[in-house]
A protein has these predicted regions:
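Active-site-proximal loop/helix segment associated with metal-binding centers of metalloenzymes
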Residues: 1-16, 20
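Charged catalytic cores and adjacent phosphate/nucleic-acid-binding surfaces used
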Residues: 18-22, 26-33, 37-116
Length: 116
């Protein structure tokens, strides 16, 4: 579906951040800023935090210990819950190789569940 040569390919549509966050919230969801290190720059991440995000993906395969500290502090400063992800896509030979390679604390999971 994501590849242009796929028979089911659907082109991406660019949507403004406030609009997509509104859609997520109206659907009862929580808007999370995903893998901030992979965004343009930390300055841009901070600029994006003017929007009504609920959480931030602090733990990610591309985040080192310094990144985790920095994003954890940003999440706390902006009252965002902390989440994490492995970015596992099931592609052989591409890290992470399996579920469970990257974990978040039970406290972070409990906080997330309490917000649902």
């Amino acid at each position: 579906i994501l590849r242009k040569d796929s028979p089911c390919y659907v082109p991406k549509v660019m949507v403004e951040v406030p609009h997509i966050i509104d859609i997520i919230h109206k659907a009862g969801g929580l808007a999370v800023m995903a893998h901030p290190k992979l965004v343009t720059s930390d300055e841009y991440v901070v600029e994006m935090l003017v929007y009504d995000f609920d959480g931030m993906e602090v733990y990610h395969t591309k985040h080192n210990d310094d990144d985790v500290k920095r994003y954890k502090a940003l999440a706390k400063e902006h009252n965002l819950f902390i989440t994490g992800g492995s970015d596992y896509h099931g592609i052989p030979g591409k890290a992470p190789d399996q579920f469970g390679d990257y974990l978040v604390s039970a406290e972070n999971v409990s906080e997330f569940i309490s917000l649902l």
